Amino acid sequence: MFLNNLPALTLGTAIPWDLVQQSFWPILSGGIYYTIPLTILSFIFGMILALITALARMSKVRPLRWVFSVYVSAIRGTPLLVQLFIIFYLFPAFNVTLDPFPSAVIAFSLNVGAYASEIIRASILSVPKGQWEAGYTIGMTHQKTLFRVILPQAFRVSIPPLSNTFISLIKDTSLASQILVAELFRKAQEIGARNLDQILVIYIEAAFIYWIICFLLSLVQHVIERRLDRYVAK
């Protein structure tokens, strides 16, 4: 087997700190210049798509509900890696040149849009119907009631699950390495390929960087939730 032919894939008797120090910045730079921008862009576009999808699935127009329901079902029913490869090879099939990074943004945005739409839809439905009636009573239209009364309340409810979606997306971007996006994990793979005898150390280092990023984001999430809780009646 391939693994049996490799040099020792263990930590050995001592951790190669020189290699860890030399590889730390190249791996981290992949996170700074690719992983984080990829996550932010995908999340922003995904949230726009999620809001559109959530509202469309609550629409009274049946064909609209059906189209977006199929979209959500297709995304939730297929692996993210498969979706990534489909988008990556879809545009060249129509003679359209698209670099790996924008291909990854499109794929991750579509994925986030489907999953986040369910969160947003559930958050909107959790707002008491009396809030709708209150908006109508003071002369607001359906659209104004939605955007000025309902969505602000739904937003607070959706913060925890959407924050978890964002943190999960950070980790999911490692799949972009499969289409040659030079993100954090891809950098680790490249360095590991040149140091096969210490490849485990490189991957542990990459995992540590992912963990630190996600841990810091979790702290930010906790602060936001505590601030929002101040406005909730106990």
Curated annotation (Swiss-Prot):
Keywords: Amino-acid transport, Cell membrane, Membrane, Transmembrane, Transmembrane helix, Transport
ABC transmembrane type-1 domain mapped to chain residues: 32-221
UniProt keyword Transport present: yes
Transmembrane segments: 8-28, 36-56, 78-98, 100-120, 199-219
Cross-referenced CDD domains: TM_PBP2
Pfam families: BPD_transp_1 (PF00528)
Gene Ontology MF terms in the entry: L-cystine transmembrane transporter activity
Main subcellular location of this protein, as a coarse class: membrane
Keyword match Membrane: yes
Top-level taxon in the UniProt lineage: Bacteria
Signal sequence coordinates: none
Biological-process GO terms, alphabetical: L-cystine transport
Locations listed in the record: Cell membrane
Function: Part of the ABC transporter complex TcyABC involved in L-cystine import. Probably responsible for the translocation of the substrate across the membrane.
Protein family membership: Belongs to the binding-protein-dependent transport system permease family.
NCBIfam families: HEQRo_perm_3TM
PANTHER family (alphabetical): L-CYSTINE TRANSPORT SYSTEM PERMEASE PROTEIN TCYL (PTHR30614:SF0), MEMBRANE COMPONENT OF AMINO ACID ABC TRANSPORTER (PTHR30614)
Quaternary context: The complex is composed of two ATP-binding proteins (TcyC), two transmembrane proteins (TcyB) and a solute-binding protein (TcyA).
Protein known as: L-cystine transport system permease protein TcyB
Source organism of this protein record: Bacillus subtilis (strain 168)
Gene that encodes it: tcyB
